[in-house]
Amino acid sequence: MNRFILSLMIMAGGAFASSADNLVLLTTNDTHSAIDIGADGVGGVLPRKAIIDSVRKAEKNVLLIDAGDVVQGSLYFKYFNGDVEYPVANMMNYDIRILGNHEFDNGLDELAKYWKNVKADRLSANYDFKGTVADGIFEPYVIKKIGKKKIGFIGINVDPHSLIIQGNYEGMKYSDAIATANKVASMLRKQKKCDLIVAVTHIGYEAIPGKASDVDLARQSKDIDIIVGGHSHTYVDPATPEKTPYWISNADGKPVLVTQTGKYGRNLGYINIDLDALDKVKDGKRAFEYMYIPVTDRFSPEAYDKDIIEFLVPYKHAVDSVNSKVIGWSMQDMQNNDHAGTYANWVADFAMNTGSDIADELRKSDPSFPNIDMSFMNVGGIRQPMKQGAVTEGQILSTFPFSNRFEIIEIKGKDIIDALKIAAIKGGECVSENITVVSDDAGNLQHVYINGKEMDPEKTYTVATIDYIAQGNDDYVTMANNRSLWQSKEELSQYILNYIRNLTAEGIPLSANPNRRFVTNISKYIDK
């Protein structure tokens, strides 16, 4: 069944071939507070719920699963801290949920407050919360009986080190994702006699070297049949298996289905499992049908959940009022998911300009305060794209939702270079236009140039950044080897808002320098 036919069936009210011998898994991941339907008519909790209701009406055995990061990324979380996302998820009647890293953004106390009220099986096999406020909330696995079959589900979470701010998970103990998943899966298979085992993960389809990923888990497993993944925002689209393979051979050569639906609730994952053919393998595939259901506003208003509509009214009014405040104008589209693209450049150049202005101001009272040599920001902090046209206050607050502080640090060149090695593997990062990072085709760093000269590993540089990076997070561990010179009291987003307002007051629209800072062509950057 292709997804076009599936979509037509959903719109028609669900004319599926329902069977007691089948199990349907509907999956989401990384919805990131995307409550409203997008400007392009895609996403939104109301169309998602309408699709879920249609499938549940048509199929006898349906389980709704979320692979983490329900929160963070829009004004709904910025202003209401989970008061919207968690109740809405409960109204959708999820069966199984796991944590993402952004569930920790407001600390363990807030996490525990909301997750105690989650109406679903709450799974985490490799986070130990004993002795913390979250103790007793999560179980490592759950077994669902579907007909005569036992289906085991395991929750596997991401390594928090250099990803989650340390104080936000203080007291929690992490265990290796792959080792834990395999241990629990083996127990479920051998002791609990499960017929099918599903790992629900928030570790990413792929990861940097040294970090576990879904592909690694699939390859190193023996007892896991399906991985429902999240974290990397990867579109593991069954329509394009050449880009992101979704059948991965395990340690015994048996195919494992690896899935992920991208981000922002733009798709629902749909996995139809033939429970009478669980051991059948043909052409490197199992008896699991996997596809995307696009979440679009194709439904009539009557199909939308009235309780959710009523619940959202006061929150939506507050969000819409901020989203309507125009503060500037952008000359171009800027994508937030391009590590070496225009939005990354714009953010880095904003940081360089603002950091230099701050340094100039500080020198009035301290003439010895150094000039800013470069900026180093993170693409992960840019949560939304920017479209050509009007720029609103709400758009900026949604794009930069974190409570990061602007910071100026001193740090050795060798520590910057080591961090840029990681950035190169990721495909790029937000660095100022006076920086050129040269790598080979595999992403291995070869040279770092600053103002056209090779960066000196032993020299101390002054860098404009954010506290999150300065603490060694986002895998940039060596950036923590710094001396802080100054940190803002206001959040980064306020500096960006003021920067845009000042540009607008001068009649200057937003535009980004398109020149790439991460390159593979070495010849033009050799010192003259």
Residue ranges of model-derived segments:
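Sec-dependent signal peptide recognition
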Residues: 1-8
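Hydrophobic h-region of N-terminal signal peptides that target proteins for export
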Residues: 9-18
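Active-site-adjacent helix-turn-beta-strand microarchitecture at beta-sheet edges
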Residues: 22-36, 63, 71-175, 209-322, ...
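Feature captures C-terminal
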Residues: 22-24, 34-43, 47, 119-126, ...
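Short catalytic helix/loop segments, enriched in acidic residues and glycine
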Residues: 40-54, 174-181
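Active-site metal-binding motif and surrounding structural segment of the metallo-beta-lactamase
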Residues: 47-67, 95, 189
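Short beta-strand/loop segments at the ligand-binding rim of alpha/beta enzyme cores
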Residues: 61-65, 193-200
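Hard-cation-handling environments
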Residues: 282-391
